[in-house]
Each structure stands twice: as C-alpha cells, then as structure tokens.
C-alpha cells in the first residue's frame, strides 16, 4: 500500500497494472514562504504562476527539493505554467527532504514551496521566513492511497482493509483531527473537503 500526493503518477501506476483501488483520503495545500520583506513581491501575486515569475524576475533566491517527489513535480508544473525554466545561481537545489530544504531556505533567506502540514509542524526551523502566498487552486495537494492488484503480494488484502478503514468515517475523523491537539490546527483536510479539488 502506498499513500501518495502525485495524482498523475497514481493514474499511471494503475494504467501500468501494478497498482489498484485509487482512494482519495485527504488533502493539504502548498504555500510559498520567504523573507517577510518579500523582495520579489510575491504577496501581491494573483496566482502561483505569477508568484513564480516574480521570483525568477527578481533573481530569487528559490530553494527546490529537486528530488522528483510529489512536491517537486508540483513545483515544476508551476514553473512550466509560469513560462520559466528555473536555472542559474538563484535556483538552489537541495536533493533533500522537506524539513532540511526548509532549513536551507531559511539560511539562504530564500523563497520555498512548503506543504502546509510541514509548515505547521516545522516552521520553528525557519524563523526568518513567513507565508507570503497561498490559496491558488493549483496549490491544493490531494492524497490518494493505492494497493497492489489482487493476488500480487501476501499482505495485499490487509493493506486493502487498511485503506477501507482510512476512507471510513472513523478514519476520516482521525485525518481531519490529526495534529489539532498539539499544533492548534489540523494538519490535513478530509476526503470530503479534498473531493472538490480531485
């Protein structure tokens, strides 16, 4: 079983025959963070693509995970929509995970696209950054669960039952409430909310 936030890759895995049972389980969103002074002026952008164009025009800096993760794929989708080929000294590639990349963005006083869950949990590692842009529909980050096709692995049926639980009312309540007690807000939206973006 895999829980993933790259819908096109999920569809490809199913089409290629090595995954089944695509099940929407929830969402969060991406947000663009950067120095409060916002030298590129992305806070005034009307879309994520416009915000990215502003970063490129200002010469960044912009930190990218550059790791072909779902986050990196979304970032590259936005650069393409912006008509920008990100390259040069202003474009810093970490090849690292989200928290390490967020720390690097803080050290560089750079712009960075974080998922909202990581930001809520880890913003303490980036005290010099703040959320500057969010809310574009393209930044919604949906999560799906998939499982191996029937008979593919010994644990496949157990994995399918777990997906059914996660999609059940009780599983969805857990997702919607996850993190609320510790951080003061939930880290994810449930599938009912996410469905409008799927």
What are these regions (language model features)?
Residues 1, 21-33:
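Short, glycine-/small- and polar/acidic-enriched structural segments
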